[in-house]
């Protein structure tokens, strides 16, 4: 008996929204608590800072880089099965990591397997919101983002409590049971009815291929379908954005990994050090939805890329404050300021990508974007660990974070401004060319041949059939002297047409 489909924007959609919030809190909020175990793991395995840093870097990198693989599973099995599969993998990885005898085993279990499972769960839960919510989609995404903030708030406090009572091995075993709640959230996600019925097409049989060539061809088609390498060649803004975000990611995750060890290095109590991460999460509960709603306002549409650069700049400057002092109350003020810039970055990072790339190319652009960001996440913590081993000073880690964030903000802001000026220059040249064409047409008669670029510009607003008039309203056949009195208005309207402005009433 077929299962009944749920209706979009129905009452069950809010239950799915709650499940999505829980899933995001369990998955995206988890990496922020890894810093609490940093010193404990370092002592357990007698490892350097760089070697210990590979654990959070692998976890975060796989969490972002496995996005295209998750998209394939969603297309094949659906969101419900993928969320539940992710919960099983994340749980299996944490349980296995509690029996690790060296860091290599920890990298594979708690790093790779758990990161893969968390990616499957969180990305599938976000995808299903687009089917369950149509009219209230913006509100649903804003509320779902609160789950991340709740996770950032609760994971550090729970981790500190379990670590004191059970040790890191017992804590990771409990975490394995907690991640099984993703399976419950996945079971709540029922199939939803869509307005578009799937089309059945009869495809011709594929040409015969050898098994090796067929596998390589299938992999190539899959990569081409989910990763937008062709957009890099044709969209300069996309290239600038990817380079800028990758450069900023080399510094952005460092405070979340090293803030707790840095506070303990300055003799801050362990409970208070764990509380710092929770302050960031609690502040984001209110700031992140507010930033998301403000970023969606039409008044900010043309300035979103500059606001994103400003948020990165503020994030880098706040890290300088953290590096200057390790006093607890100074760190509390740092966490509050860091939360403001962090919420702006989280609200704008994908919205700016939507502004730069056409929506029909957005899924492929997002796939390449997450993969390249994952590479940066993989490099960032070990690079900071090498710096820490060389200097034995945590302050240099925050100086390093500030350098990457501030330089990325200046690069993106300057590059976007230069691209905007270049585009405005092209539009001005087109307007001047249209002005010259109108002058020649008025002077020499309607039979004069237009230049190709002018024909392209004027084709956007063709002349109505049966009306043979110039842009300023005079009939083409009546070339009297009063045409020249209206010439300034004609030039103004021509420029407005070329630049895409609305004509004055």
UniProtKB/Swiss-Prot annotation:
Entry similarity comment: Belongs to the major facilitator superfamily. Monocarboxylate porter (TC 2.A.1.13) family.
Localization annotation: Cell membrane
PROSITE patterns given in the database record: MFS
First-listed, main subcellular location of the protein, grouped into a coarse class: membrane
Extracellular membrane side: 39-53, 102-110, 159-171, 261-274, 327-329, 389-396
GO MF term set: monocarboxylic acid transmembrane transporter activity; symporter activity
Annotated segments matching region Disordered: 443-464
Protein name: Monocarboxylate transporter 6
InterPro entries in the record: MCT, MFS, MFS_dom, MFS_trans_sf, Proton-linked_MCT
Tissue specificity of this protein: Highly expressed in kidney.
Free-text function comment from the UniProt entry: Proton-linked monocarboxylate transporter. Catalyzes the rapid transport across the plasma membrane of many monocarboxylates such as lactate, pyruvate, branched-chain oxo acids derived from leucine, valine and isoleucine, and the ketone bodies acetoacetate, beta-hydroxybutyrate and acetate.
Gene3D superfamilies: MFS general substrate transporter like domains (1.20.1250.20)
Membrane topology field: Multi-pass membrane protein
Residues that span the membrane, as ranges: 18-38, 54-74, 81-101, 111-131, 138-158, 172-192, 240-260, 275-295, 306-326, 330-350, 368-388, 397-417
Entries under Pfam families matching the protein: MFS_1
Native source species: Homo sapiens
Alphabetic keyword roster: Cell membrane, Membrane, Symport, Transmembrane, Transmembrane helix, Transport
SUPFAM superfamilies in the record: MFS general substrate transporter
Keyword Transit peptide among UniProt keywords: no
GO biological process: monocarboxylic acid transport
The UniProt record lists the keyword Membrane: yes
This protein's GO CC annotations: basolateral plasma membrane; membrane; plasma membrane
Cytoplasmic compartment residues: 1-17, 75-80, 132-137, 193-239, 296-305, 351-367, 418-505
